[in-house]
């Protein structure tokens, strides 16, 4: 099945680069580097504020529009979905296995429970109600709803947990919060998720207004890209 995924990757990559080159010719002042995760990843699929990456073990998708609208603010919110792939044993993902790498290459851990309870994040929650993108796109085998409960809105009946069990049938979704020293800045970030045998580094860029305008024209619909990547092998 991998060769079919790789064929899809090549087509998306060529089309994306061609589009970017055309745009750069028209607006040469805008320069955006293609991110290098530094780890083996079969594919990174990009929508405007949605990023997804996977390898032979696991799949992670994120939505970060709220973070991109929070320039200068101290707290970052990211929506994350994750699962493990077929023929991979169930895996217990713990909160200390998730972190963000900032543009200056510093590592930012997930906000702990005490830190989350001590701050008022109602503005982020309100922003998320109008500025979120759907990330409910998973490989076909992951069809059972699953909550990533590292955080829960204060006052809600939901509880916060330190871990979540992933399996190839579970499509797990939840919010992540990080305290960013010095506030959120423009530039290249990575969401790092450590699985049992591998690390996935999902790239996401906090875009300037010019970058958003340029790149928004070049990213296809994320759902179509995911469906193409995980399309069953033809017999």
Regions found by a protein language model. Give the residues of each.
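Bacterial N-terminal signal peptides that target proteins for export
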Residues: 1-8
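Bacterial N-terminal signal peptides
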Residues: 8-16
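Conserved functional micro-motifs across diverse proteins
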Residues: 22-235
């Amino acid at each position: 099945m991998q060769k079919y995924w790789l064929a899809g990757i090549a087509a998306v990559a060529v089309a994306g680069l061609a589009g970017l080159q055309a745009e750069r010719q028209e607006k040469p002042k805008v320069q955006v580097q293609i991110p290098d995760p530094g780890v083996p990843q079969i594919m990174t699929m990009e929508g405007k504020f949605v990023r997804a990456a996977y390898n032979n073990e696991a799949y992670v998708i994120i939505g970060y529009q709220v973070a991109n609208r929070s320039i200068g603010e101290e707290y970052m919110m990211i929506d994350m979905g994750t699962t493990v792939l077929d023929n991979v044993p169930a895996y217990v993902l713990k909160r200390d296995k998730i972190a963000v790498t900032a543009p200056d290459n510093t590592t930012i851990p997930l906000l702990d429970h005490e830190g989350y309870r001590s701050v008022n994040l109602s503005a982020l929650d309100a922003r998320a109600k109008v500025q979120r993108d759907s990330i409910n796109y998973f490989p076909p085998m992951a069809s059972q709803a699953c909550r990533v409960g590292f955080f829960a809105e204060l006052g809600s009946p939901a509880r916060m947990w330190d871990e979540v069990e992933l399996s190839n049938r579970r499509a797990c979704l939840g919010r992540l919060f990080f305290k960013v020293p010095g506030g959120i800045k423009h530039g290249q970030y990575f969401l790092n998720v450590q699985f049992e045998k591998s690390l996935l580094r999902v790239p996401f860029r906090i875009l300037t207004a010019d970058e958003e305008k340029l790149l928004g024209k070049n990213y296809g619909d994320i759902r179509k890209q995911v469906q193409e990547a995980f399309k069953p092998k033809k017999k």
